[in-house]
Amino acid sequence: MVSLEKNDRVMLARQLPLESVALILAGGRGTRLKDLTNKRAKPAVHFGGKFRIIDFALSNCLNSGIRRIGVITQYQSHTLVQHIQRGWSLFSEEMNEFVDLLPAQQRMKGENWYRGTADAVTQNLDIIRRYKAEYVVILAGDHIYKQDYSRMLIDHVEKGARCTVVCMPVPIKEATAFGVMAVDESDKIIDFVEKPANPPAMPGDASKSLASMGIYVFDADYLYELLAADDKDDASSHDFGKDIIPKITREGMAYAHPFPLSCVQSDPQAEPYWRDVGTLEAYWKANLDLASVTPELDMYDQNWPIRTHMESLPPAKFVQDRSGSHGMTLNSLVSGGCIISGSVVVQSVLFPRVRINSFCNIDSAVLLPEVWVGRSCRLRRCVIDRACIIPEGMVIGENAEEDARRFYRSEEGIVLVTREMLRKLQVKQER
């Protein structure tokens, strides 16, 4: 382990990101989000009023000083590719800065797509090697969080690690969805199990397990060696969590990096924020939290901005209808281009160009771009997909049986509405 002085850390915080390339795994389908990902990859799903989920990983790279980024795509990639081309063309090729889009190469005989997360990198190794990076940062493109990757890189170098895995404690009942690890006093990973049926508890806290966040740092040459060997292993599933990390744990080459050490927070006393938003309820809840008085995730931090594709839209407008009813909102996010006419919106998130007509009551709802709500509608505890037309007088979120018959209703009572579901009800989806 190398002991670094303060000045050394400042220098490395600038130097290490320049010697690194980030690879964002963005090919996931996100099946637990149900129909919300039928036509888009999970990283391309809208979030927070104006963003896409992948904007968080991309912004973390930019804010951390990593200006060489590869985005590995696969499932329903058109929307994602279009978003990155329109919103992330700010890098300078002359300065060797870029966002490369890396689609599935289909190089394996008999294989149409990537066999696993590790194979997604393996199939692009000829391109990745050209970046001539010293370190490779592997990221998931479908998580919501703010992290300074330069701090993680410093920790990687200071520990003399060949591989670093970012981790955080999670409730033991949720740990079955993660890779779970045990570490020694130096943070060396001494055991790693991917998605165990009975997750081991952390020492001293039987209610939690130490979970991998799917964020890794590798010495580049070491990663290339690992992937070459894994590619030849017919017994491997070619996945980082299932194969690569357990292997290097057995070899004693993997170290853990506690997420709180590099999590970016405006309030140092707050709990580190990281969300998978992999289920409809988690997605709905994370969006609505941003509209609360004191949200867990600070989106107003000018020192760590989240960037996205910015459309030229007029400001949101709240108008009085002919009967004298005023458009009003409370504890809500309302994006540009929205018009609220004589209706009440409470604890909700409205994405760009949403139109709500008179006499409506919108409560705890997430309305994606271009949703049009007819007069006298009541929407509660729901997610309305992009460009849906909700007909006059429709009620959603008040009758469980009716909601389950017409739309998708989760076990927690969150209702998802899409254009296809409305068409099946003979509701015209063109205006």
UniProtKB/Swiss-Prot annotation:
Catalytic activity: alpha-D-glucose 1-phosphate + ATP + H(+) = ADP-alpha-D-glucose + diphosphate
Keyword Nucleotide-binding in record: yes
Regulation of activity: Allosterically activated by fructose-1,6-bisphosphate (F16BP) and inhibited by AMP.
Keywords linked to the UniProt accession: Allosteric enzyme, ATP-binding, Carbohydrate metabolism, Glycogen biosynthesis, Glycogen metabolism, Nucleotide-binding, Nucleotidyltransferase, Transferase
Binding positions for alpha-D-glucose 1-phosphate per the UniProt entry: Y114, G179, E194, K195, S212
Highest taxon listed in the record's lineage: Bacteria
Pathway: Glycan biosynthesis; glycogen biosynthesis
Binding, beta-D-fructose 1,6-bisphosphate: K39, R419, E420, M421, L422, R423, Q429, E430, R431
Annotated positions binding AMP: R40, H46, R52, R130, E370, R386
Marked site (Could play a key role in the communication between the regulatory and the substrate sites) residue numbers: Q74, W113
Record-linked InterPro entries: ADP-Glc_PPase, ADP_Glu_pyroP_CS, GlgC_bac, GlmU/GlgC-like_hexapep, NTP_transferase_dom, Nucleotide-diphossugar_trans, Trimer_LpxA-like_sf
Any one of the GO BP annotations: glycogen biosynthetic process
Record EC number: 2.7.7.27
Molecular function GO labels: ATP binding; glucose-1-phosphate adenylyltransferase activity
Family: Belongs to the bacterial/plant glucose-1-phosphate adenylyltransferase family.
Quaternary structure, from the entry: Homotetramer.
PANTHER family registered for this protein in UniProt: GLUCOSE-1-PHOSPHATE ADENYLYLTRANSFERASE, GLUCOSE-1-PHOSPHATE ADENYLYLTRANSFERASE-RELATED
Function: Involved in the biosynthesis of ADP-glucose, a building block required for the elongation reactions to produce glycogen. Catalyzes the reaction between ATP and alpha-D-glucose 1-phosphate (G1P) to produce pyrophosphate and ADP-Glc.
Protein name, UniProt field: Glucose-1-phosphate adenylyltransferase
Organism: Salmonella dublin (strain CT_02021853)
Organism placement in taxonomy: Bacteria, Pseudomonadati, Pseudomonadota, Gammaproteobacteria, Enterobacterales
Primary gene name: glgC
